[in-house]
């Protein structure tokens, strides 16, 4: 059943080096937290299915980008083919928060003619004592750019699930309303395959009922 | 290189399964291939879904043998054609040209007679039967006009043939007046190149000649497999044996796509750099790029027969060593882990039947042992396919990461040519590993399936070999995608810090 999904969304995860992008993704896709993590080289790939409504699954293809400046020219190339993105900063690192503007500017330039639905993520919220960015100012910044704001922790598994599924739901709504459409030559949204026999879990339920009668 | 385009155009690609290609093992099993497509067998769809486009033509050694003969024949009797179709290996083309220009305008004296020349040349090339040659010569002169077309046809996918023959053609005149040495040399070189063997340049050219990219091929395969899986409503169990789906699950497709993207970008960059250069600078650079290209023609794969299976640590050590000489962190070498897991599994599944037997004697559970064995051939097959897909995906990831690091890594401590050679070695090691692994799995299958019907067992074995062979091809193709990145790296090291480079070269040598 694993292979059945309605759509495939490609999400990109960006933000300064060491804010915890790879750890967040690993927590989400593998359910574990790595104490030590090598810096990402170029880009890495992960995927997971998300059930947004009973029986409706979305396959997320998550592109984990290197935060290091030297790989920027590689990672830039991936904005274009993403429908959604998580823009991370580290709440204990003010610099990474200040750089959020730059990240947004850069994506704006390279995503043309498409658009990316972003969510602003304040990461490492387990380290509240070392906090350098208040929730209030982060929310303000997010609102200014029309983004949602969420605070997460990969280590303590706080809001990780929510960050990804909320974004997925938002994108799904846009797709349903036709504001985002599947396009040839664009990898952001792809329709999944639905097996012709078993359509969705509702039908499975129906047929089971029939059997009972 | 700028002339690569030309070699890409006259391509006749055809979809053929690549048997015994790069990996000598699967060839043995080609006979049993037809069986594998029988509808009932599980491997049927696996075998039929994914065929890798492969450059056609000239696997035939005869074609290669005849070629120089035809070429020199043509050279002797026909005026030298100067429109040198620069294809592929520009090295040959330019070499031929320089030979031509160095030769004076001496008119060809066909005093010795062309057949003499050919005979001598052929003998020096070590071609056995003179009678065979004379028939070839006859044949060649008979169908000379057609033959010329043939040359073109043969040389289509393999630019080298046409350039060699052009070189022979263009030098023909001076050769005859100036002695046989040059012709011998050309002939020898030709034979050397041909003898370098299929893997080498079939691989070099294989990818470039295709109209579709490797990831497209694999993506289509995956789609087909998805469709097939969904229409059959078989779900989990069958998904386990679908190489394409598994390859994607291990993110092989994504890494491949990313690698292709980098490769394309770099290729464009290299071209524009070459276009901006001229004169001596261009010539020097071209020469250096050719050296790089040579490092990309792979070493022979089929010579590992005698090596047999080496110790477990050897592969790990070899790969790690190779990567440390690339100055790339071996922590990124995920393939090692995947491969070790596979071996552990093989280890346990090989000892399992024995242990089972002993326990069976104790507990007298004959039926359950049979059940275990029955399950295990399918299990082994599924695990084999999974392992191959994983190892291949990891290898592609490895190449993708290497590409990123070559382009944006720390300052270079190793030259691009050295890196190319090492990567070529890595490719060989990975492919050998696939071959060894597939042998292990099939041994496993054979052992576990002694009591099985051959109709059940053979398709499974065939599928394992087929996927191993395909895997090796994907890895080799992915390796070829690295060339533009190394070209960039070479150019950058030249332009950015010429003094430093000199120093480093000396240090490294």
UniProtKB/Swiss-Prot annotation, chain A:
Sites where the protein binds GTP: 17, 20-23, 37, 40, 67, 123-124, 126, 154-155
EC annotation from Swiss-Prot or TrEMBL: 3.6.5.2
Regulation: Regulated by guanine nucleotide exchange factors (GEFs) including C9orf72-SMCR8 complex, which promote the exchange of bound GDP for free GTP. Regulated by GTPase activating proteins (GAPs) which increase the GTP hydrolysis activity. Inhibited by GDP dissociation inhibitors (GDIs).
Keywords: Autism spectrum disorder, Autophagy, Cell membrane, Cytoplasmic vesicle, Disease variant, Golgi apparatus, GTP-binding, Hydrolase, Intellectual disability, Lipoprotein, Lysosome, Magnesium, Membrane, Metal-binding, Methylation, Nucleotide-binding, Parkinson disease, Phosphoprotein, Prenylation, Protein transport, Transport
Entry-annotated residues carrying Phosphoserine: 201
Lipidation (S-geranylgeranyl cysteine): 211, 213
GO molecular-function terms, A-Z: GTP binding; GTPase activity; myosin V binding
GO terms under cellular component: cytoplasmic vesicle membrane; Golgi apparatus; neuron projection; plasma membrane; vesicle
A GO BP annotation: autophagy
Family statement drawn from the similarity comment of this UniProt entry: Belongs to the small GTPase superfamily. Rab family.
Official protein name in the record: Ras-related protein Rab-39B
Lineage: Eukaryota, Metazoa, Chordata, Craniata, Vertebrata
């Amino acid at each position: 059943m694993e292979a059945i999904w309605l759509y495939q969304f490609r999400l990109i995860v960006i933000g300064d080096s060491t804010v915890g992008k790879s750890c967040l993704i690993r927590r989400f896709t593998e359910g574990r937290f790595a104490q030590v993590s090598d810096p990402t080289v170029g880009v890495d790939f992960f995927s997971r299915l998300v059930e947004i409504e009973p029986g409706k699954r979305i396959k997320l293809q998550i592109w984990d980008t290197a935060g290091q400046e030297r790989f920027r020219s590689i990672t830039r190339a991936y904005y274009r083919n993403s429908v959604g993105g998580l823009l991370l900063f580290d709440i204990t690192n003010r610099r990474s928060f200040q750089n959020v503007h730059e990240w947004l500017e850069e994506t704006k330039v390279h995503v043309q003619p498409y658009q990316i639905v972003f969510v602003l993520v304040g990461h490492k919220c387990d380290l509240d004592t070392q906090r350098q960015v208040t929730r209030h100012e982060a929310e303000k910044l997010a609102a200014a750019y029309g983004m949602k704001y969420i605070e997460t922790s990969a280590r303590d598994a706080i809001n990780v699930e929510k960050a990804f599924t909320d974004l997925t739901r938002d994108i799904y709504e846009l797709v349903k309303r036709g504001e985002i459409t599947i396009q040839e030559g664009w990898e952001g949204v792809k329709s999944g395959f639905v097996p012709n026999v078993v359509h969705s879990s509702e039908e499975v339920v129906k047929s089971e009922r029939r059997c009972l009668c | 290189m700028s002339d690569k385009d030309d070699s890409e155009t006259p391509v006749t690609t055809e979809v053929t399964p690549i048997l015994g290609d790069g990996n000598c093992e699967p060839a043995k099993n080609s006979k049993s291939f037809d069986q594998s497509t029988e509808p009932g067998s599980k491997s049927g769809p696996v075998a039929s879904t994914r065929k890798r486009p492969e450059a056609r033509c000239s696997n035939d050694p005869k074609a290669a043998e005849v070629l120089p003969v035809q070429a020199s024949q043509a050279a002797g009797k026909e005026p030298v054609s100067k429109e040198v179709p620069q294809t592929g290996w520009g090295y040959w083309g330019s070499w031929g040209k320089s030979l031509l220009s160095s030769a004076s305008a001496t008119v060809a004296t066909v005093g010795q007679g062309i057949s003499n020349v050919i005979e001598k040349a052929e003998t020096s090339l070590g071609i056995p039967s003179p009678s065979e040659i004379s028939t070839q010569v006859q044949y060649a002169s008979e169908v000379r006009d057609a033959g010329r077309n043939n040359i073109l046809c043969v040389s289509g996918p393999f630019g080298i043939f046409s350039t060699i023959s052009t070189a022979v053609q263009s030098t023909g005149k001076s050769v005859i007046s100036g002695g046989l040495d040059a012709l011998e040399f050309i002939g020898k070189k030709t034979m050397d190149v041909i003898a370098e063997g299929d893997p080498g340049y079939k691989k070099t050219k294989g990818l470039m000649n295709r109209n579709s990219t490797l990831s497209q091929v694999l993506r289509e395969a995956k789609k087909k497999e998805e469709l097939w899986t969904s229409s059959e409503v078989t779900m989990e169990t069958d998904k386990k044996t679908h190489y394409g789906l598994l390859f994607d699950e291990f993110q092989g497709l994504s890494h491949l796509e990313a690698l292709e993207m980098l490769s394309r970008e770099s290729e464009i960059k290299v071209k524009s750099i070459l276009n901006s250069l001229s004169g001596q600078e261009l010539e020097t650079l071209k020469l250096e790029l050719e050296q790089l290209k040579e490092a990309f023609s792979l070493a022979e794969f089929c010579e590992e027969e005698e090596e047999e299976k080496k110790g477990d640590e050897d592969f790990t050590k070899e790969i790690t060593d190779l990567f440390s000489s690339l100055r790339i962190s071996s922590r990124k070498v995920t393939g090692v882990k995947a491969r070790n897991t596979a071996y552990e599994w093989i280890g346990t599944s090989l000892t399992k039947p024995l242990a089972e037997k002993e326990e069976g004697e104790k507990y007298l559970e004959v039926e359950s042992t049979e059940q275990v064995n029955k399950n295990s051939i399918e299990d082994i097959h599924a695990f084999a396919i999974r392992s191959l897909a994983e190892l291949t995906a990891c290898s592609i990831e490895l190449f993708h990461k290497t590409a990123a690091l070559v382009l944006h890594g720390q300052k270079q401590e190793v030259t691009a040519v050295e890196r190319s050679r090492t990567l070529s070695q890595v490719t060989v090691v990975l492919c050998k590993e696939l071959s060894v692994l597939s042998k292990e799995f099939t041994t496993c299958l054979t052992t576990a399936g002694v009591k099985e019907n051959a109709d059940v067992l053979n398709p499974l074995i065939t599928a394992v070999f087929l996927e191993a062979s395909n895997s090796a091809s994907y890895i080799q193709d992915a390796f070829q995608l690295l060339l533009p990145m190394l070209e960039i790296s070479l150019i950058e090291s030249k332009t950015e810090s010429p003094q430093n480079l000199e120093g480093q070269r000396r240090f490294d040598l």
